[in-house]
Amino acid sequence: MTDPLFNAACAAVVRPSGQRGGVLRLVTSADVDSLDPARTYYVWSWLLQRTMQRTVMAFAASPGPAGLRVVPDLAVAPGSTPDGGLTWHYTLRRGVRFEDGTPVTAHQVKYAVERVFAQDVLPGGPTYLIGLLDDPADPYPGPYRDARPGRPGLRAVETPDPYTLVFRLRRPFADFDYLMAQPTSAPVPPGADTGAGYERRPLASGPYRIGEYRPGRRLRLVRNPAWDRSTDPVRSALPDEIDVTVGLTPHEVDARVLAGEFDINLEGRGVQLESQRRIAADPALLARSDNPVTNFLQYISIQPQVPPFDDVHCRRAVHYAADRVALLEARGGGVFGGDLAAGLLPPGLPGHRPYDRYPAGPDGRGDLARARAELAAAGLPDGFETVVATQRGKFRVVADVLAHSLARVGIRARVAELDIAGYYRTGLGLPATVRERGLGLAVTDWGPDYPTEYGFLAPLVDGRLIKPGGGNHNFAELDDPRVNALIDAAQSAGTAQERAGLWAEVDRAVMEHAVILPMVYDRTLHVRNPGVTNVYVHPAFGLYDIQAMGVAR
């Protein structure tokens, strides 16, 4: 694509402006996974959280490499550690208030962290903090089941005064500032907490609060009158309202964004294949489109807990039978869809090493002879039946292409389309559902929780991060002591070169299990309304940073 305005928002701010007012009109085919900062994991839900909630740290509001930095948000400075990452100290800003006027203090941040431990009540969000802060000899059950005298809470987090936080970790962790940029560090007042019901009306500490929420239909955010711009170094808060329309089909979303009825597709998975072709042929549409490298991996998860995938030969048969070229074309091809992937770590991370454990033949269309040999080794020369889980839109196209390519060797995959909003909480992300519904294969994707190898790979393959209660992303429930040990070794390696080499080993060790079929290192084609201002693709999320956007029309 040669249009000079195409991809303009990938590296710079398009239409910079300080104009305030108006309504930012967003649209999505699916509802948020949760409005509770402890329970959300969808990347676009995190971008909404940036408008509603303050966190201890936050990704910088910048395009390009600068946006990958985490900067102080509620904190006045990055965390300090006197002992190499074992203890972390933060001082919080004064003058920050919840929407009801209550001051935000360290106690409410500590309580927010404690809520993460209540996985029986609040599953769904990231759980790094549990592994770093919990005492295995005396596990903390979360604030709802803390029966100890005086309910002392999580002892590993101290609040010596209202504006000081001290975290005492079980092991050194150099990336702790990144964890403090996740929604799980957004403060929650204990008196406002309603447990599982908090997601219906969380209390805002950021520039916008909920004005109206009709699940599956509409979310309207209005200004938070208690927000003080002078205390917030991250957020622009230009529009008076942010209005999110929910529940259109992916094709309806495309049509109405292209027609100018909405400003962007909040979900951010990119336009459908028909719209890609339309944009490519229309210079006016191309000039307001962006096709960033997202650092996401599009992949097929293969579940060993669902027979016959408990046999590695059946898993390998899927790898060899898959038509990699057709799967890439289902994502939009090499122009808009991304690049063929062989390993797990995307090229933007130092641990990436080109590696193809299961070659797909000279034309990339699959090695059917090797696939049949693997089926024979499993004692299933005629193939078998299974279910492939997916969502609507491009995920469905991928599932259909996968099923067609596997059928060439006798693997009969029935496509099951699951609800998008609950896909990772109660569908593919709930181990019991995977077993009950026999979801042997699943179409999914993953981007790093933060831009390091640990932030990318650990949730997918570290057995200690499996979440039986939902919100699980280690879909294969891989718990290999060697993989876990390599992860720990990589985290404690002394030099960047050592770390990168060890992460490459993790990648290879996981591929030996054949539980992940990498498809595409992702590119996503986004479209923006010409009436929006301050628009850029945030490099940490791969989507437009809605907290920065304004409107001028």
Task: Give a label for each model feature.
Residues P4-C10, V27-D83, R201-L203:
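N-terminal lobe/hinge region of extracytoplasmic solute-binding protein
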Residues A60-P65, D138-A147, R151-E158, P162-T164, ...:
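Gly/Pro-rich hinge or "lid" segments in bacterial periplasmic/extracellular proteins
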Residues V76-L132, V166, R256, P308-D310:
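Aromatic- and charge-enriched surface segment that lines or borders ligand/interaction sites
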Residues G211-V222, D243-V306:
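Extracellular/periplasmic solute-recognition and catalytic clefts
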Residues H526-R553:
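Long beta-strand-rich cores associated with HINT superfamily self-processing modules
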